[in-house]
Amino acid sequence: MTTSIVIGVVLVTVGLTFGWTIRWLYARFHLSACEQRAERILQEAQKEAESKKKSILLEAKEYVLRERNQQERDDRDRRAELQRAERRLLQKEEALSTRAGELDSRERSLKQRDQSLCQEEARYRQELERVSGLTQNQARDLIIKNLENEAKHDAQALINKIEEDAALNAERRARDILVTTMQRITADVTGDVTVSTVNLPSEEMKGRIIGREGRNIRALETLTGADVVVDDTPEAVVISCFDPVRKEIARISLERLVLDGRIHPARIEEIVQKVTQEVSQKIYEEGEKVLFDLGIHDMCPEGVRALGRLYFRTSYGQNVLYHSKEVALLASMLASEIGADVAIAKRGALLHDIGKGVETDSDRNHAEIGMEMARKMNEDPRVVNAVGSHHNDIEPCCVESWLVQVADAISAARPGARREMVDHYVKRLENLEAIAEGFSGVEKAYAIQAGRELRVLVNNDKIPDRDVKALGRDIAKKIESDLKYPGRIRVTLIRETRVVEYAR
């Protein structure tokens, strides 16, 4: 058993030794083959690298040679071009030298001719001075003077002709424009009426209007400032007042009282207050109406109200609002005919008399007041100038201001447009009221009875009873010294204390 194992081990050992030996021999042989093959590959690679190296060197030499040859050819071409350019420059230089010589020769020739001409000119000038007996300066002055006189004569003749043609054409053109404008406009003619008539249902109503001891008629006259005349006119009462606003308030109030039938001082006061508010609203509506008719927008409320007040104002018998509207239409048409600013001309013409609708105690004329109001209304400076210059109080600054003056003159000069007697009468009554209202403590003054009576309402807190007579005398003396009037003027002072209490 042991022997078998030993034999087996020996056999295994021998087998392993033989296998290892065979493996070593095979590896050595294979390594030798690989080395030979690697050496062969290396030799081939070296040969190929050497071949490529020679090829690259050869190509590089050929490239360098080609570049060198090309550079040499380029250099030869540049040298040839430079030589040709140099030859051309030399030729040009020679030509310029020749031309310069010719120019020098011609310049010398011209100088010689110039000197010869100067000598000839001097000789001829001396000969002319000897023949004419005038020196050069004298002859020049004589010629200039003759030419100047001739030019002045021709210029004056041309100026005269232009002025004559311009005057003729301007007059004809202005006439055509005015005729065309006046034909395009139609204006209502309104007269200044200082009295209104209120129809009564019966004669008995006159007694109710007068009231017990005249209380009703006195209250109506005191509240409205109008003169209520109850005479023999059948079924009619006459209301007289120079202020159209107060006359309108009195007329409407009396008509409503007659229609209502309740006529007593308290009812009269209530109706007058309500009618006063309605008339104030009508004033604003009249201003809006004329603005709408003329197509004017962006007017401030105070301006609209001032325009509306012109509806109740008259100037020489002419309604001021209608007059302003007519002037605005005329000015806009004139502006369109001559190419001026139509909007500015129309706006300035409408506002030119707005100062007459401003309630103020200032002694300035209506043009100054209107110009100040237009400036406060942020109107265009040309509109402000047109308002202030329509009576030449200031210098017009633009053609639109002149157009407003022309349109104002056309409207005022239209036959039947104005009546001066009525305006003088109204002015006298306004001055009469202004004198009384100028005293301290006077609240309101009304001229009635065609200016023969002045009723003055005084403040009972400022004027006690003991001073009423003295105030009346002062007002009468002031009227005597400041106004001229026919007959006598009755001054009546009214001082009233009213106490109102409520029982609860």
UniProtKB/Swiss-Prot annotation:
GO biological process: mRNA catabolic process
Compartment(s) of residence: Cell membrane
Membrane topology: Single-pass membrane protein
Entry keyword Metal-binding: no
Key word Nuclease present: yes
Principal place of residence: membrane
GO molecular function terms noted in the UniProt entry: RNA binding; RNA endonuclease activity
Domain HD: 320-413
Transmembrane segments: 2-22
Disulfide bonds: none
GO cellular component, one term: plasma membrane
EC number: 3.1.-.-
Top-level class of the enzyme under EC nomenclature: hydrolase
Function: Endoribonuclease that initiates mRNA decay.
NCBIfam families: HDIG, PRK12705.1-2, RNase_Y
Family: Belongs to the RNase Y family.
Protein name, entry field: Ribonuclease Y
Organism this protein belongs to: Treponema pallidum (strain Nichols)
